[in-house]
Curated annotation (Swiss-Prot):
Lineage per the UniProt record: Eukaryota, Metazoa, Chordata, Craniata, Vertebrata
Domain WAP: 27-74
A Pfam family the protein falls into: WAP
The protein's name: WAP four-disulfide core domain protein 12
Molecular function in Gene Ontology: serine-type endopeptidase inhibitor activity
Amino acid sequence: MGSSSFLVLTVSLALVTLVAAEGVKGGIEKAGVCPADNVRCFKSDPPQCHTDQDCLGARKCCYLHCGFKCVIPVKKLEEGGNKDEDVSGPCPEPGWEAKSPGSSSTGCPQK
């Protein structure tokens, strides 16, 4: 096998690998956007998901509160959201406390 044949084979294998990896990583993105995350982390939590397809229902895989989690997405105002509607993201889990200035759970049910 000549050096030019080897080069063509190597480049072809590299392209096939990149295309296959992109297909696995990408998947179909669900509607909505991930909520803003203004929490600073010293250490990331292990991921609970890698793509939107790992999440049930309408939930999206988003980086939130120090790790990737399945969360209810924020509605875009252009997609029929009400301008008075709170679109800051999902309410935190019970027991969550604001970890940075400006973080709050305004509009969430009280414990």
